[in-house]
Amino acid sequence: MDQISAILPIKTRGRHYADNIGRCDILFSSLRHFTTPDTFHRIVLVVPHEEVEEVKGYAKAWADFPIVVIDESLHMGIFAEFSQRHQIRNWHRQQIIKLNAPEWIETEYFIVFDPDCFATHPFTAQTLVPGGRALTHRGARNLHPDIWQASAKLLNVDPGLDLDGLWWTPTMLSRTLCLKLHERLAQIHGTDWRRVLLANYAVDWTEYTLYWLNACEQGLVDQYHTWAQPGQRTLHAAESVWFANEMKEWNAAQHFAENSDGLFAVVQSNTRIPLEQVVETLSPYFPIRIQPYERHFDAALKGAELYSAIARRGLKLLNKMRGRVTA
């Protein structure tokens, strides 16, 4: 495997997104240090229409990589069908964008990035696709049973909670398996796969649980995915920072050490850990360049997003009581 692609949805406005450009600077600084631009055939940045020109300007700092900035509105017009505030779930919309990657990439395998992840060890395309299959990180399904059960309902399959599943971003996916998921959702529900997912905005499906359950159901996991073998690093470090109180105890030196496991780690953006603290923690291990950027804070938008979250919680509880999936 000579090259892979990458997809990275970016927002700069909203509750958790004000420092996403700075976080992307960290991500690309790590990629610059631990791999080369030639690893990637294309890195697709998918951006809301109103943020496209701004992100294009910031993306010049990453122009040594094969960056393509995509206007979300030109490809995701279906989002407009779900425009009521409680229907707008940015987390789900970004997951749909990730599953839509086959529209924008040509390679069989691609890595999914979020702005808050970064590399911790050297890698190439061959590292991520050993023997022609995607390097995959295990995670027990029963750690998060709700998301596996929600996705299983949409696919009419058993959630298999006693089995391992696919772990979080960054994750390697197959273009072919994404397309097969699109086909299966459309076949079951009789409409565009994206509409199926958008209509179920109050259900906690996720892109990876849907992808993995469908691949398992079709018996295709072993054809397209592989686990790390002895002597190979896993995709994820042994620990990432998922909650703010974990940052103090997170041992960066350990996770960047030559004898440590894992190619990537995460300092989750919704922890509200200051960007400066993240840079201070990581900069001893790779050079980081943070460009000047504007932090957008909109109190009205924040209030609207909070209302949306509260409304969805109520709908989710109601749907759970009814056992409902929307076609």
Where are these regions (language model features)?
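Short beta-strand/loop segment that forms part of the nucleotide-sugar
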Residues: T39-E50, V69-L74
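Catalytic core and acceptor-binding pocket of nucleotide-sugar-dependent glycosyltransferases
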Residues: L161-Q254
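Short aromatic/hydrophobic "clamp" motif used to bind/position activated sugar donors
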Residues: F110
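Short, acidic, metal-binding catalytic loop of nucleotide-sugar glycosyltransferases
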Residues: S29-T39
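Active-site-proximal specificity loops/subdomain of glycosyltransferases
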Residues: Y58-E103
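N-proximal low-complexity "stem/linker" segments adjacent to membrane-targeting elements
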Residues: M1-S29
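Conserved donor-nucleotide/metal-binding helix-loop-beta segment in metal-dependent transferases, i.e.
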Residues: A119-A152
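Membrane-proximal basic amphipathic "stem/tether" segments
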Residues: M1-D2, Q268, I273-A327
